[in-house]
Amino acid sequence: MEKKALKEIKCDLVVVGGGPAGMAAAVAAYEEGLRDILILERDDKLGGILRQCIHNGFGLHRFGEELTGPEYAARYEKMVMEYGIPFMTDTMVTGISPERVVTAQNTKEGIFKIKAGAVILAMGCRERPKGALNIAGHRPAGIYTAGTAQKFVNMKGYMPGREVVILGSGDIGLIMARRMTLEGAKVKAVLELMPYSGGLARNIEQCLNDFGIPLMLSHTVVEIHGKDRLEGVTIGKVDANRQPIPETFEYIPCDTLLLSCGLIPENELTKEYIQRSREWADGLHQPFLS
């Protein structure tokens, strides 16, 4: 059977990612006079991670008022709509060539190509999973990244568990400590490998101190217990080389472990196709990674 030619279109600017950064980039380009813009988003709606961030604290610098995550995203989505900037949701970008040919696919169009004058990458990050942390033990149910738990609670209406330990004190971990507490769970501790927290001081105060949740610095999870469902974790203090100190080990019974251990950039598209540079390429609107 003869192969069907891939559909190819042209566009002055393709924005990969329809989260707040992608929408802001598209809006800024439009306000600078560019009109031929296309946003590609793999999720079914624009907004990215902010759709599940129902806490406030967004928008103070950009809009001069305090907004929740969905409200902040909605502001940009409204501008995208008002400006008539086209976007495609449920669309996965699978490649970008050095000639700025973007390959994407969705259920409606199948596989198609876009010859772009310029490409903006706004794919965001993903959370570091348990497999990247080298924690001893089995793989029982009850272990989630903090963002996954946030989506379950805020968007799906599911509670991941009732007795919780959180590893990592980044802002999402601190916010989920408060969120789980408000939903009736008992957060027994937030552990942080470093001797300082990775979160904002206001989040430590509002999410931990206000609820009496202990923050244990220079501590980590050294072993996971349980086979079918998480039964508990062994924690311990770490030395200056971040190695666990055996005489400090302590067992904490819990049915849920949330991981807030950093983010991994969604940069796979850049590795093969895009030249890394700290300069603005050569004035020809070449895609770049700074």
Question: What are the roles of these predicted feature ranges?
Answer:
Residues 1-290:
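Residues forming the flavin
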